[in-house]
Every structure is written in structure tokens, then in C-alpha cells.
């Protein structure tokens, strides 16, 4: 993923702008409409941009027809246009008024012995899986499972009672009731 490489190299010290990106909703190779696939990819894209790339300042999409037959014109496909509009308006992180401020939300990638506050926090998952074929994610926090069924697979976890303790968080992603990915984290809860 080119964006991962650019972000990993510069994201911690430079603002990032993605220009000239887009999803053609017509496959030239197969000569078929792939609107449903593009709508899902667009939903994933706008859901995960502020989570995975919090220092990304702007993402600009193509809005034109390609001479090679690829279709990027948003206004010509109502489903893709609707997904685009929903993507940019559903998150408070995307602002339409430059003088307004997005909410103070911070995302951190979990790793073992990561420190979390003794408070209620939200956990979410970014699962790198071909075609993102995940039906649901189960988070088990100190033996108590909670399930989320849609991206970004968010659940609330209250660490208030675990101040000064180590908490075990097991995350399992499922497809057709079979585990496709899992990871366990040991987190330090602050006093």
C-alpha cells in the first residue's frame, strides 16, 4: 500500500494530502460494472482514514471519465456518489468549515504493554484482509466478550476498575463463524 509507505515515512512529522485518488466503478478488463465493490471500498476508505492515518489532512477523488474506459465520474453513478457523500459527512473528523475544529479524538495502535487510562475507552479494529471479508469481531476483555458487526468494529471497554492492573484484550475477527485473524494484547491501566 503506497499510502502506508508515505504515511509511515512522513506522517509523524508532516501533514499528508492524498490527491488524484479514486475507484473506477467499471472494470475495463472484465467489461463489467463493479459498483457494489466500489461502494464497499469507499465506505471502508472513509471509515478508516481518520483511524489509520490521523495526520492526513485532505483526500481528493477523481471526478472524471478516463479515456481508457474507466469510470471515475461520481455524478454519473448515484450509488457511488451516495457512498462518497456519506463517507465525508458521517465522520466528525471530516470538516466542511475550515474555521471549525474536529472533536478531540485520538487513535493509537495497540501493542503489548501499551498504557491505557483507567476510564471508558473505545476499541476498534483495522483488519488487513483481502476484500475485507470479516463478518464480525469479538473483543474479550479480561474474559468478558463483546461483539461488533460493522466497520470499524467498535466496542466500549471500561477500564475504571482495573487501575494499576494489567488487562488482557483478545481480538478475534470472524468470517462464516471461523476465525480469520486474532491477536492478544496485555495492556497496562494507569492509576
Where are these regions (language model features)?
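Generic detector of leucine side chains in alpha-helical contexts
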Residues: 3, 49, 56-61, 73-74, ...
Amino acid at each position: 500500500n503506497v499510502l502506508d509507505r508515505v504515511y509511515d515515512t512522513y506522517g509523524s512529522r508532516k501533514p499528508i494530502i492524498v490527491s488524484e485518488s479514486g475507484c473506477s466503478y467499471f472494470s475495463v478488463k472484465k467489461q463489467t460494472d463493479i459498483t457494489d465493490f466500489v461502494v464497499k471500498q469507499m465506505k471502508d476508505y472513509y471509515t478508516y482514514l481518520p483511524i489509520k492515518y490521523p495526520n492526513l489532512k485532505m483526500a481528493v477523488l477523481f471526478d472524471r471519465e478516463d479515456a481508457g474506459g474507466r469510470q471515475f465520474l461520481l455524478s454519473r453513478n448515484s450509488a457511488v456518489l451516495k457512498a462518497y457523500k456519506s463517507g465525508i459527512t458521517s465522520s466528525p473528523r471530516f470538516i466542511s468549515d475550515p474555521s471549525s475544529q474536529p472533536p478531540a479524538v485520538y487513535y493509537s495502535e495497540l501493542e503489548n504493554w501499551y498504557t491505557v487510562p483507567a476510564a471508558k475507552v473505545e476499541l476498534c479494529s483495522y483488519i488487513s484482509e483481502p476484500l475485507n471479508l470479516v463478518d464480525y469481531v469479538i473483543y474479550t476483555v479480561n474474559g468478558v466478550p463483546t461483539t461488533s458487526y460493522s466497520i470499524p468494529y467498535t466496542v466500549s471497554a471500561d477500564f475504571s476498575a482495573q487501575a494499576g492492573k494489567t488487562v488482557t484484550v483478545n481480538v478475534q475477527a470472524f468470517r462464516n463463524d471461523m476465525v480469520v485473524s486474532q491477536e492478544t494484547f496485555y495492556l497496562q491501566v494507569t492509576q
